Amino acid sequence: MADLQERGHLLTEQVNPLSQNLDQLSSLELVELFNSEDLKTVEAVAAAKVQIATAIEQTADRLRQGGRLFYVGAGTSGRLGVLDAAECPPTFCTPPELVQGIIAGGAGALVRSSEDLEDRAEDGDAAIAQRHITQLDVVVGITAGGTTPFVQGAINSARQRGALTIFIACVPAEQVSFTADIDIRLLTGPEILAGSTRLKAGTVTKLTLNILSTGVMVKLGKVYGNRMVDVAVTNQKLRDRALRILQDLTGLSREAAGFLLERSSKWVKLALVMHWTGLDKDAGDRLLSAHQGNLREAVASYKNQND
């Protein structure tokens, strides 16, 4: 573990030479500087694309076997993990326990700074034990500077339980080395405001989690083409989206699409199976279940057997 008392050598703590006159910039100059620095976040994701792709494949494999995905972090990193986890149920109709966020300090830390709680590795260990992590699960540790004891404690505990571990940090391994199954380094350089990792480090983390969770859900068959066919229809906006998906993919009128959606218990994926195969709700559900919810595979299998 790195020396927690001295972090000045860390990339995320260094002073950015391009922003040394930050307090003297005009508002327009400040925006231009932020815009140019933020371009580095996209470059950092590109540089880590192989590791991110590996994380997608291996995470999807664990979840197919009944595993769960956990994000672990403190401060901004923890909040981003909780945010990404919270978006999965409405977007992909996943149960809330499938993707979970663990933040040092618990729910209260989402709205009130609790950074002092990140220094306890034993709390990270306890968080993993409390959730009964097994070899089927995936634990993603997120720590911009790479040294957060809460995250390191959680990852070490998860490794001991046989879980797939993924480490995400914004410092090079030469500065902070850590043992995990997949090591993702997102190097965006010093922050415009020195040490404020809610900036580029936060942005690049959000980009990466977007790709990771969406990629996993694509691999799990939660998407057809680029449509969220497992969207949870829980309000008027999402009902409208569901109807437009059905209209676009079937050519039905809005009224007919609405009727089909109701017949399928508001499940777009099942509605499409029913429309494309002529099966009733129960038979369509069984067909999807036989193909682990993969719409494309289910429909192709039915057509191959009935041509």
Swiss-Prot record:
Catalyzed reactions: N-acetyl-D-muramate 6-phosphate + H2O = N-acetyl-D-glucosamine 6-phosphate + (R)-lactate
Start and end residues of each SIS domain: 59-222
Biological pathway: Amino-sugar metabolism; N-acetylmuramate degradation
InterPro entries, per the entry: Etherase_MurQ (IPR005488), Glucokinase_regulatory_CS (IPR005486), MURQ/GCKR (IPR040190), SIS_dom (IPR001347), SIS_dom_sf (IPR046348)
Any one Gene Ontology BP term: peptidoglycan turnover
EC number(s) reported in the record: 4.2.1.126
Domain of life: Bacteria
Location of the active site: 87 (proton donor), 118
Keyword vocabulary terms for this entry: Carbohydrate metabolism, Lyase
Lyase keyword on record: yes
GO molecular function: carbohydrate derivative binding; carbon-oxygen lyase activity; ether hydrolase activity
Any one Pfam family match given in the protein's UniProt record, by short name: GKRP-like_C
Family of this protein: Belongs to the GCKR-like family. MurNAc-6-P etherase subfamily.
Primary role: Specifically catalyzes the cleavage of the D-lactyl ether substituent of MurNAc 6-phosphate, producing GlcNAc 6-phosphate and D-lactate.
Note: A lyase-type mechanism (elimination/hydration) is suggested for the cleavage of the lactyl ether bond of MurNAc 6-phosphate, with the formation of an alpha,beta-unsaturated aldehyde intermediate with (E)-stereochemistry, followed by the syn addition of water to give product.
Quaternary structure (record): Homodimer.
Protein's recorded name: N-acetylmuramic acid 6-phosphate etherase
Organism in which the protein naturally occurs: Nostoc sp. (strain PCC 7120 / SAG 25.82 / UTEX 2576)
Record lineage: Bacteria, Bacillati, Cyanobacteriota, Cyanophyceae, Nostocales
Gene: murQ
